[in-house]
């Protein structure tokens, strides 16, 4: 347990007469308080079987407050305050429990009340657990715990939680009263020890002087957090959840740090919430990732919700402790309406907190990548008040065939992002599918329309040069020479094959007719000039065989030319 704030000093003059009066009536003797006490205020010793009343400070009549009584007890011997030293510089008195007693330790609520801002009890709401043996009182006239007949198991630490709300500024105090019940055997032994004469101490050897070396210079930093472990609120309240971070630096080296707030929404049927400390330092351990009691325990931070996180890189130490606010860092805050970080970038501020904000809030501070400080605060409403303890052991791993426990079935916090409704998902999917089908149909129609409008042929010039022969019924005895540009006299295939003369070629025969020349009005064909020069022509020539001799068969009458082939080719071109 962490040290808590003592009661207000202005109430001490009023408490002293009440403590003396009730101490005499209950035969309870306040024991000597350990110096430096911060969390344990008074220790009472009572006889077994005698009535005991543990008084608490009365409520202020002019403010609105929430108060509650709880007791820390267990199967082991009743806890008692003991001195606790964090190091050689800081020591205080707190309740210490053995590791074997942690599983049986319990913080049981006794009573809780909400007091209105008026002098009388009108408007007060009080809830007291029905226990005929122990009765807790939170009235305006009497505040305390009344035990009809004290027993040994009634020993323990009784806490009075008091929080002022409204215009009082959310002031919180926690008073701890320790009760020790002495049995009859212990009382007889104490009386026998008082009757024995005191003997002087036996002188021993002279003390040996030893020289102590100065401790080595420390490096790094040290952090401490002192939050309240429980915070009871009413839906709609606005309050500050503070961890009271304390920082101490031993050198000037820059450092990196991170601040994380984790939230665990507790199940409604959990009677005890365990925080496994080993899982905070080893979040990736299999037992921490899959604990057996996942719904009622805080194991690995990876299993919880991150409500606020801030990362600092290359931060300079600040002796005044303002480094979380002065250093630059990247921050993340959960998008919830009722939660935001405080101005110091460490604490949390709740604005109009709803009932769904109840749960366990765990604070973790890392220094250069290592966890240096952590603690928790149980923020709940009065109807969901449960117990929370820190467990220093490893959690039990869930069975391999056991189903993964899910989060508790509770409503989401107000303003938290929620998933879309199933009907909305179906509607959006249907609209999207219809849109895709429409786009595909439109694309097919456009492509078909373009294909129907596109010409599958190119317009060719039907009047260009065509290399063909005139239709005739006679055997094809026509020689088509090359074009004029490639024509040479020394390569004339129509020259005499038996001629061995290498001189210039003779002029073409007189019977060669140029079909491409300009026609004459008398004969329709132009004879080639004698000098062999020709005007620009298409390059097509047709050579006809000489008329046969007289002994040959008479020539047949010329048939009409067949232009079907030419017409078919022209049609194919014009298509």
UniProtKB/Swiss-Prot annotation:
Chain segments carrying region Interaction with gI: 76-101
Residues in the signal sequence: 1-26
Ranges in the topological domain labelled Virion surface: 27-423
Membrane topology value: Single-pass type I membrane protein; Single-pass membrane protein
One Pfam family here: Herpes_gE_N
Coiled coil feature spans: none
Region (Disordered): 186-218, 394-416, 491-560
Keywords: Disulfide bond, Glycoprotein, Host cell junction, Host cell membrane, Host endosome, Host Golgi apparatus, Host membrane, Membrane, Signal, Transmembrane, Transmembrane helix, Viral envelope protein, Virion
PTM section of the record: Phosphorylated on serines within the acidic cluster. Phosphorylation determines whether endocytosed viral gE traffics to the trans-Golgi network or recycles to the cell membrane.
Biased composition (Acidic residues): 491-503
GO cellular component, one term: membrane
Intravirion side: 445-575
Disulfide bonds: 270-296, 279-288, 315-327
Compartment annotation: Virion membrane; Host cell membrane; Host cell junction; Host Golgi apparatus membrane
Region (Acidic): 484-502
Stated role: In epithelial cells, the heterodimer gE/gI is required for the cell-to-cell spread of the virus, by sorting nascent virions to cell junctions. Once the virus reaches the cell junctions, virus particles can spread to adjacent cells extremely rapidly through interactions with cellular receptors that accumulate at these junctions. Implicated in basolateral spread in polarized cells. In neuronal cells, gE/gI is essential for the anterograde spread of the infection throughout the host nervous system.
Record text on subunit structure and interactions: Interacts with gI.
Family: Belongs to the alphaherpesvirinae glycoprotein E family.
Protein's name in the database: Envelope glycoprotein E
Organism this protein belongs to: Bovine herpesvirus 1.2 (strain ST)
């Amino acid at each position: 347990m962490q040290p808590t704030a003592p009661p207000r000093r202005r109430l001490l003059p009023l408490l002293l007469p009440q403590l003396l009066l009730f101490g005499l009536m209950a035969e309870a003797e306040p024991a000597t308080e350990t110096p430096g006490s911060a969390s344990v205020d008074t220790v009472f010793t009572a006889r077994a079987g005698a009535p005991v009343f543990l008084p608490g400070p009365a409520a202020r009549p002019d403010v609105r407050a929430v108060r509650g009584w709880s007791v820390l007890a267990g199967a082991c011997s009743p806890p008692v305050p003991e001195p606790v030293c964090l190091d050689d510089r800081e020591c205080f008195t707190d309740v210490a429990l053995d590791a074997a007693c942690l599983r049986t330790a319990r913080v049981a609520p006794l009573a809780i009340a909400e007091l209105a801002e008026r002098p009388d009890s009108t408007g007060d709401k009080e809830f007291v657990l029905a226990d005929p043996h122990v009765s807790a009182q939170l009235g305006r006239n009497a505040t305390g715990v009344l035990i009809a007949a004290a027993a040994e198991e009634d020993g323990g630490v009784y806490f009075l939680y008091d929080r002022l709300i409204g215009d009082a500024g959310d002031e919180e105090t926690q008073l701890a009263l320790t009760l020790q019940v002495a049995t009859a055997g212990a009382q007889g032994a104490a009386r026998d020890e008082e009757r024995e004469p005191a003997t002087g101490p036996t002188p021993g050897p002279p003390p040996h002087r030893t020289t102590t070396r100065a401790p080595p210079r420390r490096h790094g930093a040290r952090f401490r957090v002192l939050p309240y472990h429980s915070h009871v609120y009413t839906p709609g309240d606005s309050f500050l959840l503070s961890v009271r971070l304390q920082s101490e630096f031993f050198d000037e080296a820059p450092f990196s740090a991170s601040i994380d707030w984790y939230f665990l929404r507790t199940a409604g049927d959990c009677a005890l919430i365990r925080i496994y400390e080993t899982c905070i330092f080893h979040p990736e351990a299999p037992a921490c990732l899959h604990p057996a009691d996942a719904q009622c325990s805080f194991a690995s931070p990876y299993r919880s919700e991150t409500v606020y996180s801030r990362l600092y890189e290359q931060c300079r130490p600040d002796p005044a402790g303002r480094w979380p606010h002065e250093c630059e860092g990247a921050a993340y805050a959960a998008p919830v309406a009722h939660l935001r970080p405080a101005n110091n970038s460490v604490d949390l501020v709740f604005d109009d907190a709803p009932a769904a904000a109840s749960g366990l809030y765990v604070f973790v501070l890392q220094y250069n990548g290592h966890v240096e400080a952590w603690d928790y605060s149980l923020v709940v409403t009065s109807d969901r008040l449960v117990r929370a303890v820190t467990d220093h052991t490893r959690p039990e791993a869930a069975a391999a065939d056991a189903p993964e426990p899910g989060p508790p079935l509770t409503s989401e916090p107000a303003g938290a992002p929620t998933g879309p409704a199933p009907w909305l998902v179906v509607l959006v999917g249907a609209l999207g599918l219809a849109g895709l089908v429409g786009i595909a149909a439109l694309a097919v129609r456009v492509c078909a329309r373009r294909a129907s409008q596109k010409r599958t042929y190119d317009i060719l010039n039907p009047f260009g040069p065509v290399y063909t022969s005139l239709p005739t019924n006679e055997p094809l005895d026509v020689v088509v020479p090359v074009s004029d540009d490639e024509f040479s006299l020394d390569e004339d295939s129509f020259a005499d094959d038996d001629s061995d003369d290498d001189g210039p070629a003779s002029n073409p025969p007189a019977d060669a007719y140029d079909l491409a020349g300009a026609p004459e009005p008398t004969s329709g064909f132009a004879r080639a000039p004698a000098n062999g020069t020709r005007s620009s022509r298409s390059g097509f020539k047709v050579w006809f065989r000489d008329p046969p001799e007289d002994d040959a068969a008479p020539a047949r009458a010329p048939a009409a030319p067949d232009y079907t082939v030419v017409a078919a080719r022209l049609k194919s071109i014009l298509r």
